[in-house]
A protein has these predicted regions:
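A short alpha-helical cap/connector motif
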Residues: 1-145, 153-178, 182-215
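Active-site residues of response regulator receiver
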Residues: 149
Protein backbone atom coordinates (compact mmCIF):
# COMPACT_ATOMS: atom_id res chain seq x y z
CA UNK A 1 0.00 0.00 0.00
CA UNK A 2 1.42 3.38 -0.99
CA UNK A 3 1.73 5.98 1.73
CA UNK A 4 -0.29 9.13 1.13
CA UNK A 5 1.47 12.46 1.16
CA UNK A 6 0.69 14.59 4.23
CA UNK A 7 -2.35 16.77 3.64
CA UNK A 8 -2.09 20.43 4.58
CA UNK A 9 -5.14 22.31 5.87
CA UNK A 10 -3.92 25.36 3.92
CA UNK A 11 -5.28 25.08 0.39
CA UNK A 12 -3.78 28.28 -1.02
CA UNK A 13 -1.18 27.23 -3.60
CA UNK A 14 0.62 30.57 -3.34
CA UNK A 15 1.10 30.22 0.42
CA UNK A 16 2.14 26.58 0.16
CA UNK A 17 4.69 27.42 -2.55
CA UNK A 18 6.42 29.91 -0.23
CA UNK A 19 6.37 27.42 2.66
CA UNK A 20 7.86 24.71 0.44
CA UNK A 21 10.55 27.11 -0.80
CA UNK A 22 11.47 28.04 2.76
CA UNK A 23 11.59 24.40 3.81
CA UNK A 24 13.95 23.60 0.95
CA UNK A 25 16.25 26.46 1.94
CA UNK A 26 16.30 25.61 5.63
CA UNK A 27 19.79 25.44 7.09
CA UNK A 28 20.83 24.99 10.70
CA UNK A 29 24.23 25.58 12.35
CA UNK A 30 26.15 22.80 14.13
CA UNK A 31 24.45 21.96 17.40
CA UNK A 32 20.96 21.81 15.92
CA UNK A 33 19.38 24.87 17.48
CA UNK A 34 18.43 25.76 21.04
CA UNK A 35 18.29 22.16 22.32
CA UNK A 36 21.74 21.41 20.92
CA UNK A 37 23.44 24.59 22.06
CA UNK A 38 25.06 27.49 20.20
CA UNK A 39 28.64 28.61 19.91
CA UNK A 40 27.35 32.17 20.33
CA UNK A 41 24.53 33.53 22.50
CA UNK A 42 24.14 36.52 20.17
CA UNK A 43 21.24 36.09 17.71
CA UNK A 44 23.00 38.39 15.23
CA UNK A 45 25.74 35.77 14.90
CA UNK A 46 23.24 33.59 13.02
CA UNK A 47 21.59 36.30 10.95
CA UNK A 48 21.61 34.07 7.86
CA UNK A 49 20.07 31.08 9.65
CA UNK A 50 16.31 30.80 9.37
CA UNK A 51 15.34 28.90 12.52
CA UNK A 52 11.76 27.79 12.00
CA UNK A 53 8.98 25.61 13.28
CA UNK A 54 8.26 22.37 11.44
CA UNK A 55 5.26 22.07 9.10
CA UNK A 56 3.36 19.86 11.56
CA UNK A 57 3.62 22.59 14.18
CA UNK A 58 2.57 25.24 11.70
CA UNK A 59 -0.44 23.26 10.56
CA UNK A 60 -1.52 22.76 14.17
CA UNK A 61 -1.20 26.51 14.75
CA UNK A 62 -3.35 27.13 11.69
CA UNK A 63 -6.04 24.65 12.78
CA UNK A 64 -6.19 25.94 16.36
CA UNK A 65 -6.39 29.55 15.21
CA UNK A 66 -9.23 28.64 12.85
CA UNK A 67 -11.10 26.83 15.63
CA UNK A 68 -10.67 29.82 17.95
CA UNK A 69 -11.75 32.23 15.20
CA UNK A 70 -8.61 34.09 16.21
CA UNK A 71 -8.17 37.68 15.09
CA UNK A 72 -5.09 38.79 17.08
CA UNK A 73 -2.08 36.52 17.66
CA UNK A 74 1.58 37.05 18.51
CA UNK A 75 4.94 35.33 18.15
CA UNK A 76 8.49 35.49 19.46
CA UNK A 77 10.60 35.25 17.41
CA UNK A 78 9.57 35.75 13.79
CA UNK A 79 12.92 34.74 12.27
CA UNK A 80 12.34 34.60 8.48
CA UNK A 81 8.59 34.24 8.83
CA UNK A 82 7.73 30.54 8.61
CA UNK A 83 5.38 30.53 11.61
CA UNK A 84 4.13 33.96 10.58
CA UNK A 85 2.82 32.50 7.33
CA UNK A 86 0.68 29.94 9.15
CA UNK A 87 -0.67 32.58 11.53
CA UNK A 88 -1.35 35.08 8.74
CA UNK A 89 -3.09 32.46 6.60
CA UNK A 90 -5.39 31.67 9.53
CA UNK A 91 -6.11 35.37 10.10
CA UNK A 92 -7.07 35.82 6.45
CA UNK A 93 -9.17 32.66 6.34
CA UNK A 94 -10.94 33.71 9.56
CA UNK A 95 -12.09 36.84 7.76
CA UNK A 96 -9.41 39.22 9.01
CA UNK A 97 -6.92 39.75 11.80
CA UNK A 98 -3.25 40.36 12.55
CA UNK A 99 -0.25 38.37 13.64
CA UNK A 100 2.18 40.53 15.61
CA UNK A 101 5.71 39.22 15.33
CA UNK A 102 8.93 40.30 17.00
CA UNK A 103 12.40 39.85 15.50
CA UNK A 104 15.64 41.45 16.67
CA UNK A 105 17.77 40.81 13.55
CA UNK A 106 17.02 43.46 10.87
CA UNK A 107 17.94 41.19 7.95
CA UNK A 108 15.44 38.59 9.14
CA UNK A 109 12.72 41.23 9.47
CA UNK A 110 13.25 42.12 5.81
CA UNK A 111 13.22 38.47 4.75
CA UNK A 112 10.06 37.73 6.73
CA UNK A 113 8.25 40.69 5.19
CA UNK A 114 9.34 39.59 1.73
CA UNK A 115 8.11 36.04 2.32
CA UNK A 116 4.75 37.34 3.55
CA UNK A 117 4.46 39.56 0.50
CA UNK A 118 5.31 36.65 -1.81
CA UNK A 119 2.54 34.61 -0.15
CA UNK A 120 0.00 37.42 -0.48
CA UNK A 121 -0.33 37.71 3.30
CA UNK A 122 1.48 40.96 4.10
CA UNK A 123 -1.78 42.70 5.03
CA UNK A 124 -2.30 40.27 7.92
CA UNK A 125 1.08 40.66 9.65
CA UNK A 126 2.89 43.31 11.67
CA UNK A 127 6.57 42.53 12.24
CA UNK A 128 8.08 44.61 15.03
CA UNK A 129 11.85 44.96 14.92
CA UNK A 130 13.62 44.85 18.27
CA UNK A 131 13.77 43.11 21.63
CA UNK A 132 10.55 41.17 22.27
CA UNK A 133 10.61 42.24 25.91
CA UNK A 134 9.84 45.71 24.59
CA UNK A 135 8.07 45.12 21.27
CA UNK A 136 5.47 42.74 22.73
CA UNK A 137 4.76 44.71 25.88
CA UNK A 138 1.61 46.19 24.30
CA UNK A 139 -0.23 43.92 21.86
CA UNK A 140 -3.15 46.29 21.46
CA UNK A 141 -5.74 44.14 23.19
CA UNK A 142 -6.44 40.53 24.15
CA UNK A 143 -4.72 37.93 21.98
CA UNK A 144 -5.95 34.46 21.07
CA UNK A 145 -2.69 32.58 20.51
CA UNK A 146 1.00 33.14 21.25
CA UNK A 147 4.00 31.24 19.88
CA UNK A 148 7.21 31.43 21.92
CA UNK A 149 10.05 30.03 19.83
CA UNK A 150 12.88 32.49 20.29
CA UNK A 151 16.53 32.80 21.18
CA UNK A 152 17.45 31.21 24.54
CA UNK A 153 19.18 34.35 25.82
CA UNK A 154 22.14 34.71 28.16
CA UNK A 155 22.58 34.06 31.86
CA UNK A 156 19.62 34.12 34.20
CA UNK A 157 15.98 33.57 33.21
CA UNK A 158 15.49 32.43 29.63
CA UNK A 159 14.00 34.85 27.15
CA UNK A 160 11.05 32.47 26.85
CA UNK A 161 10.34 32.87 30.56
CA UNK A 162 10.71 36.64 30.41
CA UNK A 163 8.46 36.92 27.37
CA UNK A 164 5.71 34.64 28.72
CA UNK A 165 5.53 36.77 31.87
CA UNK A 166 4.99 39.83 29.66
CA UNK A 167 2.45 38.37 27.24
CA UNK A 168 0.47 35.96 29.46
CA UNK A 169 -1.66 38.76 30.98
CA UNK A 170 -2.56 39.81 27.42
CA UNK A 171 -3.73 36.32 26.40
CA UNK A 172 -7.46 35.77 26.71
CA UNK A 173 -8.90 32.91 28.74
CA UNK A 174 -9.34 30.06 26.28
CA UNK A 175 -6.28 31.11 24.30
CA UNK A 176 -3.18 29.02 23.65
CA UNK A 177 0.57 29.33 24.06
CA UNK A 178 2.88 27.07 22.06
CA UNK A 179 6.56 26.69 22.98
CA UNK A 180 9.11 24.97 20.79
CA UNK A 181 12.32 24.91 22.83
CA UNK A 182 11.24 23.48 26.20
CA UNK A 183 13.19 25.96 28.34
CA UNK A 184 12.94 24.57 31.90
CA UNK A 185 11.96 27.86 33.52
CA UNK A 186 9.27 28.43 30.87
CA UNK A 187 7.86 24.97 31.58
CA UNK A 188 7.92 25.74 35.31
CA UNK A 189 5.73 28.76 34.63
CA UNK A 190 3.04 27.19 32.42
CA UNK A 191 2.89 23.98 34.48
CA UNK A 192 2.36 25.84 37.75
CA UNK A 193 -1.40 25.77 38.47
CA UNK A 194 -1.10 29.26 39.94
CA UNK A 195 -0.19 30.60 36.48
CA UNK A 196 -3.69 29.94 35.15
CA UNK A 197 -2.65 27.40 32.51
CA UNK A 198 -3.08 23.71 31.87
CA UNK A 199 -0.29 22.31 29.75
CA UNK A 200 0.79 19.23 27.83
CA UNK A 201 3.77 18.07 25.77
CA UNK A 202 3.03 17.09 22.17
CA UNK A 203 5.25 14.65 20.23
CA UNK A 204 6.17 17.25 17.61
CA UNK A 205 9.76 18.25 16.79
CA UNK A 206 11.11 16.36 19.79
CA UNK A 207 8.61 17.88 22.22
CA UNK A 208 6.33 20.89 21.80
CA UNK A 209 4.56 22.39 24.80
CA UNK A 210 0.95 23.48 24.27
CA UNK A 211 -0.65 25.44 27.09
CA UNK A 212 -4.28 26.54 27.45
CA UNK A 213 -5.14 29.58 29.55
CA UNK A 214 -8.01 28.64 31.85
CA UNK A 215 -7.98 31.46 34.40
Amino acid sequence: MSQEQPHSPIQDARVNAVIERMQAARRRPPGGGPRGGFSSRDPHAYAEQGFSIHPEQGELIYMLCRSLRATRVAEFATSVGMSTLYFAAAMRDNGGGTVIGSEIVPAKVETARRNLDDAGLAAYAEIREGDARKTLRDLGGPVDFILIDGWPGGEGPSLARQVIEIVAPQLRVGGYVMNDNAEPDFLDFVRDPKSGFVSMTLPLKGGTELSLKVA
